[in-house]
């Protein structure tokens, strides 16, 4: 059973993971198995994104992700670059996904209505989403943040001002709102930062 002594295996595997390459070796976090996505995972990832768009709209966040975002092309690029991760349950079913990308992010170079607390190296989390049958969505976020903090001391992330769910999750996990950044298309996003204690 792969989930026996998962925390023991997690420490062994994570100690051997390369920050640059994100080895495909599994890492266990909060009963979830996190691994690099493959092209075979794309249909499930796109399904989770579709569910996330529905959840956003039901909660009043109507504009963050249009129907075409995140596109299959974006997912393929994330996978090709080794940035797309999936969170799997004990049966191996993908219940969440996120992109973990080493900084610097060009859209974070300028921040308005505030400032970044430091200029230390960081990783950026983009396109985080959980399936509707994943149970508590915060568990996917917890897995994502814990996994990323094993690779960096600082995480930056942004979200739409209307994404009440994500604002709540970020606050719950100790992220601090630093200001507003502009995406490449000029759309504003609330920018968050957390440094590992």
Language model regions located:
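A short beta-loop-alpha structural element at the N-terminal edge
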Residues: 33-47
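A short helix-loop-beta-strand connector motif used in the catalytic cores of GNAT acetyltransferases and
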Residues: 73-86, 103-107
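Conserved acetyl-CoA-binding loop-helix of GNAT-fold acetyltransferases
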Residues: 135-150, 168, 172
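Conserved GNAT acetyl-CoA-binding A-motif
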Residues: 150-161
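Conserved active-site alpha-helix within GNAT-family acetyltransferase domains
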Residues: 162-179
């Amino acid at each position: 059973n792969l989930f026996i002594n998962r925390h023991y295996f997690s420490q062994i595997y994570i100690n051997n993971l390369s920050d640059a390459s994100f080895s495909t070796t599994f890492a266990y976090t909060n009963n979830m198995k996190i691994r690099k996505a493959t092209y075979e995972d794309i249909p499930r990832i796109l399904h989770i994104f579709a569910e996330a768009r529905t959840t956003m709209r039901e909660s009043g966040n109507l504009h963050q992700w249009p129907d075409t975002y995140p596109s299959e092309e974006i997912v393929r690029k994330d996978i090709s670059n080794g940035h797309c991760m999936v969170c799997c349950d004990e049966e191996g079913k993908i219940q969440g996904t996120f992109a973990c990308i080493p900084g610097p992010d060009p859209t974070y170079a300028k921040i308005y209505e505030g400032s970044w607390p430091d200029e230390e190296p960081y990783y950026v989390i983009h396109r985080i989403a959980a399936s509707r049958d994943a149970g508590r969505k915060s568990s996917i976020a917890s897995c994502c943040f814990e996994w990323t903090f094993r690779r960096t001391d600082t995480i930056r992330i942004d979200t739409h001002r209307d994404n009440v769910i994500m604002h709540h999750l970020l606050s719950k996990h100790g992220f601090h709102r630093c200001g507003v950044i502009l995406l490449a298309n000029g759309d504003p996003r609330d920018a968050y930062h957390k440094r590992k204690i």
